[in-house]
Structure formats: C-alpha cells, structure tokens
C-alpha cells in the first residue's frame, strides 16, 4: 500500500488513507485488499476551455465556482442548476471536493454529461486568472446582499461555499461582491 501511495503521489493522483470500516463500506462487502480506486465518469476540461466556450458563443462568461463542495449529491445538484441557468461551466478544486462520479452524474440528471467541469489545483489562483480575464467574482454569503437587489450582468464567476462552512476566508477575500 505504501508503494501504491508513493506512485500515486509521483503521478499527481490524489489519494486518501481511510479506516478498514470505511473501505468495507465503500466496497459494499466485496474484497478490497486494503485499496480502492475511484475514477471520474468524465474528463475534466481546463479553465481556458470554459472561457473559450463563452467566447465562441459570443457571450460573457458565466461560471460556477465550488469551494470545497464535498457531498456528491450537492455537486450534482449544483451542476444541474448551473446548466439550467445557462452557465458555461463549473470549477471545482482537486482537493477537499467531490469529484465527477456516478452519484454526481445521477443527481445532475445528465447535466454533468455536457456541462464542462474544470478541476483546478489552486482555486485562489484560478479566481485571480478569471479576474485577469475581466470576470467579476460574486460569492454567496449569509451577510451579502440579496441577489434580487443586484444587476447580475457581464462576465460572472459565482462562488458557492462548502456545506458546513461556506466560503473559505481566502476565497471570500477575493470576491468583488457578496450575495
């Protein structure tokens, strides 16, 4: 198992050590030999790909940014809602986030099959890159303005914070507006 973890790290593959009980639950009683691999059901795209999609449509970018959404059902619901709202894509962090899996696809009602999702190493740096491309960053926060009081036009990146804690401090500090 140590070798598998070392090789995964060398290849930039995320891994997580869990308890035997967790492995048993994940394998649903099947033999796991102490290791379970989980892969994405779809390929991720780059941030540039999402910006290009908006550009090709001659539209201002509308991007949903997920800050540590860990529950796959919630990520699927966000993707479904983003697609229905006309977003050009969704951004998720590589760490501390649900990934594209069967649960996300099912909950998204198929939207995860066609709405591009970018998985980034550094969410804060990605937000900076969006700002450099003229995108205004709106964060969802209990202390923000009501979205009905704001004219949401132009290039928009909308941040949705984690289930338990909302946006992290660094991410919140990067917002141009709070809703």
Locate each region found by the language model.
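N-terminal positively charged helical leader segments and presequences
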Residues: 1-56
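RNA substrate-binding interface of SAM-dependent RNA methyltransferases
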Residues: 1-14, 52-149
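Glycine-rich nucleotide phosphate-binding loop and flanking beta-alpha elements
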Residues: 24, 43-45, 72, 98, ...
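Short basic, glycine-rich beta-strand/loop surfaces that mediate nucleic-acid
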Residues: 26-40, 108-111, 116, 153-161
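Structural motif
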Residues: 34, 61, 132-135, 155-157, ...
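Active-site/ligand-binding-proximal alpha/beta "capping" segment
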Residues: 138-179
């Amino acid at each position: 198992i140590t070798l598998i973890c070392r090789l995964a790290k060398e290849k930039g593959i995320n891994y997580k050590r869990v308890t035997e009980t967790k492995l048993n639950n994940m394998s649903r009683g099947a033999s796991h030999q102490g290791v379970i691999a989980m892969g994405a059901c779809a390929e991720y795209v780059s941030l540039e790909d999402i910006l290009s999609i908006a550009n090709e449509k001659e539209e201002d970018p509308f991007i949903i940014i997920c800050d540590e959404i860990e529950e796959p059902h919630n990520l699927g619901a966000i993707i479904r809602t983003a697609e229905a709202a006309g977003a050009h894509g969704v951004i998720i962090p590589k760490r501390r986030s649900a990934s594209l899996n069967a649960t996300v696809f099912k909950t998204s009602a198929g939207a995860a099959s066609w709405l591009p999702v970018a998985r980034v190493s550094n969410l804060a740096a990605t937000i900076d890159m969006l700002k450099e491309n003229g995108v205004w960053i709106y964060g969802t926060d209990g202390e923000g303005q009501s979205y009905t009081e704001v004219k949401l036009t132009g290039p928009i990146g909308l941040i949705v914070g984690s289930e338990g804690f909302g946006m992290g401090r660094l991410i919140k500090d990067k917002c141009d507006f709070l809703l």
